[in-house]
Structures are given as structure tokens and as C-alpha cells.
Amino acid sequence: MRWLAPRADASVVLTRRPSECLAAPADAQGAYLVELGRAAFRTPLLLGGQAARAGVQCETCHRGGRNNPDFDFPGISGAPGTADVTTSVLSSHRGDGIDNPKPIPNLSGPKSALKVSQDPASPALESFIHGIITQEFDGDEPAPAVLQGLAAYVRALSPGACPSRATEPVTAAAALADVRRTLQAAIAALDHNDGASAALMVEAARSQLGDIDERYAGPALAEQRAALERAGADLAAAESDARRVAPSARADITIWLADEPAWSRPVLAAEPASLYSPRQLSLASH
């Protein structure tokens, strides 16, 4: 329930999200880069400094690759849905001492409404994203393929690809599907002999499991939390091996994916008692 506008109903905002307007590329290399970028977009590990410690990710301001009218971060937002990208709260590079929050742009809206060119022939978007990571959020230098992937993901967001329903439920099943998708991106990065990107993907998957864990609060769900924590720990060796592009990394991830349905079944069965449930979230927020 962090960074929600005071009048936002957490039981609605945190149990539904904007549907993703993603036009997946038809070519294999393009699809690979989009998957890398999509996963990186959804992990705070991409960023640095205060943002990473607070759990901020690209998805925080751009839910579903859109915007976030309910975003309200102390010292960064003015009105809900705005952010000051030149604040020293999150950046040691771009702080200008001026309180000037601006509306968060909708990355899935018309390309003409965005200030940075998304022409694939131009490096402008990659340069802009690089500045966001390393300057605006004090992050480390991203792996080249991750930077390319983030740009590819943003370019693939299109109003023409928006589903008929503007929002979709936030569920444990969807969250676990994202974990699997992120690990498939890790395997693809290993196939590209890219240890840095593969390691980030495994780290991102572990972080996603932690996010799911947070929704299973309370003594009654201790068994489900333990299963999620074991699942995260089981990826630790794969993360280390991925960085070295060791053959064992691919094997570890493949085994993890094969084992996931068995341990996740009780987790999914307990979802109605978790904070994925609008009712449970409403009770917890009052």
C-alpha cells in the first residue's frame, strides 16, 4: 500500500491493474529483447540508491506500461500521478533543488504524445533510458542487451495493442506466470551467452517471488510463505551460476520450472485468504 494517493481505494487499486498494450515482435531476436526489457521494467534491481531500497521499479510509475494516476510518493509527487524527476530524493546526479513534479506519461498512448523519439533508427530512446537508470535513479550501468530490451519493450507498447478490457485482476496466478516468464528470459539470455542479463533475470524472478510472499500475510498463511521463500532460495545457485554462464544455471532453472506447479498449487489454493483478495486487502487497510 506504499505510494498510494490518500483517497485511493487500496482494495481496488492493488487488486486490479491496467491491461498491457504490448505488440510482441514477430522475429525471434526482437521477441527476446522485449522479454528481457519487460522483466527489467518490473524489478527494482535495475535501479540504484534510494529507489532500489524502496522497491521502486519502472512499473511503479508506469503500471502495465501505461501511467499511474494513483502514484503519490512523498517528496517526489505533487498531485497524485505526478513525479519530480529532478529531485535529490532519488538522485545524486539530477537534483536541481526545484519542486517541479510533472504528470507521469502514458507509455502505451500515442507515440506522438511522448517527448522522446521511439524511431528504432535513432539511439534517442536508449540514451534517455540509460540516463533514467544511471542518473535519475543512481543505478549501475545496465547490461547492453538489457538496455536494448528496455527500449524494445517501450517501443512495442502501442494503443493499437490494448485489450478490450482496460484493466485486469491482480492475481497470484498471474504473478507466478510472470516469474516463469522472467526465468524463460534468463534461459534465453544464457543461450545468448549473456551472463549479466541472465543473472538480472534470475534476481528479478526472486524479487517477484518476494512480492508474492508479501501478499500472504499472517500466521494462517505461514506454510505458503515458507514455500515461496524456499522457491526463492532454490534459485540462489542459478543466479550465481548464470553470471558465469555456467551450464548448471540452465539446468537449475529448468528443474525449478518443472517443480513449480507442485509447490505453487497450495499457494494458489490459499489465494482467497491472501492480500490478493479485495476483501482481505480492504480489511487490512482499514
Residue ranges with predicted function:
Residues 1-286:
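Periplasmic c-type cytochrome electron-transfer domains
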